[in-house]
Amino acid sequence: MTTPHAILEHTFGYNSFRGTQEAVINHLIAGDDVLVLMPTGGGKSLCYQIPALARAGTGVVISPLIALMQDQVSALHELGVRAGFLNSTLSPQEAWQTERALQNGELDLLYVAPERLLQDRMLDLLDNARVALFAIDEAHCVAQWGHDFRADYLKLDILQQRFPDVPRIALTATADVRTRQEIIGRLGLENAQQFISGFDRPNIQYRIQQKNNPRQQLLRFLRDEQKDSAGIVYCLSRNKVEQTAAWLCGEGFNALPYHAGLSASLRAENQRRFLREDSIIMVATIAFGMGIDKPDVRFVAHLDLPKSIEAYYQETGRAGRDGEPATALLLYGLEDVVKLRQMMAGSEGNELFKRQEQQRLQAMLGLCEITSCRRQTLLRYFGDNLDEPCGNCDSCLTPAQTWDATEAVRMALSCVYRTGQRFGANHVIDVLRGSNNEKILNFDHHKLSTYAIGKHLSVDEWRSVFRQLVARGFLDVDASGFGSLLLNDACRPVLRGEQAIQLRRDIKTTATSATRRAPVAVAPEDEGLWFALRACRKRVAEEHGVPPYVIFHDATLREMLEQRPLTPSEMLDISGVGDSKLERFGDEFLEVIREHEYA
């Protein structure tokens, strides 16, 4: 049997394993079941690809990512790995050829969608094939409360019953303790070895800003910091996705929309362009992103509040997979909380489910309003610890100021009470600031004792007060109606003057108030070779019909730039260059280097 180290070096072109990879691989090769939690970019795929090559038979990978299977298989072909996939995109003839290759033992890895795997015909095929292992990718899809839930994942315990001697590995990039237990219970992994890597992504800078003028805030961020960068902008609704993408195009950016309401062909084309072209901004709902391997995504921006810390961590984790500096920007306001609570109130599910959804939203609000290190709070949620503040989030780079808001809070709560707990924040703020608009006059709210008592604070300052009161649980939102603010038991000590309140003072954030660490720059004297290597990669990628990063990551090109290999043996010493890639297109890159070296 070929050793894991030999496969790592000769097939994948790397000299050493990272983190827990080697331990995971050894357990799986030995026939043990394994559960792996590893952050995005941590190298999860090697944890099943190498054992599939080391063990006799075919490694079967169950994945919900139908749209990405072709790229995943193409990437393996470039490495010289015999791989195939089965899903609904194949013609009957193509599917038959792949099934025949499986039966004949001609596949090292087979990617299959869960709904395809669970068909009797497919299970019968696997009965008659030699299966090396089952890899259940994106295992958090088994969690019924998660936005990535796939009903077919609940039936994957059949693998344990029908193939008891075949080892299984379940993998995910994000799972709190509750989701972890759900994965174990539903997939029958009670005896699995668990490998939980740290959740920290130190290269991602986390920033959360009050939403004032979101389009202008996003535009300033893009123009000042992300010129020519690839990134993802998340929006809550399909309509907002399309409007934002069109607006960005009008501002000179190359932006594409992605949501479940678009045709399958347009989604596939936009995804293909995002993966293959430079400087594309994908504007999307949460329907986009799972399994996206593009390493050079420099930013993820949220124009609406995610429903949970799990969703936020997973979506922001799509930035900076190459380890280079990246930014996660979230713009959030009180209207986000109202909208999400209304959506949750109207969602399917019993009261327990809805209560758990509200608790997850409350945890997300806590992350938004925290005045200490955001990364420490984020990691603590997943049971991970960071001893010192990170120095790479907005709270660390621009420490939050607080102010004694006790009197302002009492004014706010009193005005909610005086207006009958029937209105949203905008109307209550108008009353506090003494507006004489038609709505106030119609309801006689200009006659209230709280009318015009809050002129000393601006509209934005009052919005900050109400946002923080809702986030900290001093006010409730009537989710079933029009977002009216409601008093609760927690606010009574404040109204009675028994409790003082400190609130965060929102900062008018500019792009320079948080320090952006730029990706490693190329020295001026190296720029000619750098651009020539990138041009060579793009040309080879187009010839092979794959995204450029499938040929070589930027880190590999950067090492070529530093080491200047001139022979095949020297090229093999470059991290990311294995035997197959050297044979297929190593000469083209060597020729580029030689031309510049001897020029």
Positions of predicted regions on the chain:
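Short, charged low-complexity linear segments at domain edges
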Residues: L352-F382
